[in-house]
UniProtKB/Swiss-Prot annotation:
Cystine pairs: none
This protein's name: Flagellar assembly factor FliW
Family: Belongs to the FliW family.
GO biological process assignments: bacterial-type flagellum assembly; regulation of translation
Localization (cell): Cytoplasm
Keyword Transmembrane among record annotations: no
Self-association and partners: Interacts with translational regulator CsrA and flagellin(s).
GO cellular component, one term: cytoplasm
Keyword annotations: Bacterial flagellum biogenesis, Chaperone, Cytoplasm, Translation regulation
Length: 145
């Protein structure tokens, strides 16, 4: 299957690259099918709609940048995504890419949870959490005078 993408042009996909989001993503409820497109030699992955090329999100697995990040999924989410054990899950967070890149932030309050075996996912909005929608990827640095 070939699709047009925002960042990679035309891409040929295997079924293994596809992930279904039963309810879409918040704000993009009509987008149900996405492809996971890793950016080679980088920690970034693109979550690309297969229906609309301009609907694409830059994501990372959060643990390299936020080593203490942890979430607990409720039973309803685990049931919806058919999660039985921890290694069923891939966890990503969506980035807001900024210029300069050092100002890029990650949305830790709404991770994208994917069952890697069933190829189904959901963006989970966490409540009662210290996480916010904008956490800097790179700590602010103070320039020496």
């Amino acid at each position: 299957m070939n699709i047009e993408t925002k960042y990679h042009g035309t891409v040929q996909l295997s079924q293994l690259a596809l992930v279904s989001f039963e309810n879409g993503l918040p704000g993009f409820e009509h987008e149900k099918q996405f492809a996971l497109l890793p950016i080679h030699d980088s920690p970034f992955t693109i979550l690309q709609s297969i229906q609309h090329k301009d609907v694409a999100f830059v994501m990372i697995e959060p643990f390299s940048y936020f080593p203490t990040y942890e979430i607990e999924l409720d039973d309803a989410t685990c049931e919806q995504l058919k999660i039985q054990k921890e290694n069923d899950v891939a966890l990503y967070v969506i980035l807001t890419v900024a210029e300069p890149f050092t100002n890029t932030t990650a949305n830790l309050q709404a991770p994208v949870v994917i069952n890697v075996h069933e190829r189904i996912g959901k963006q989970v909005i966490l409540t009662n959490t210290p996480y916010k929608t904008k956490h800097r990827l790179f700590p602010e640095t103070v320039e020496a005078k």
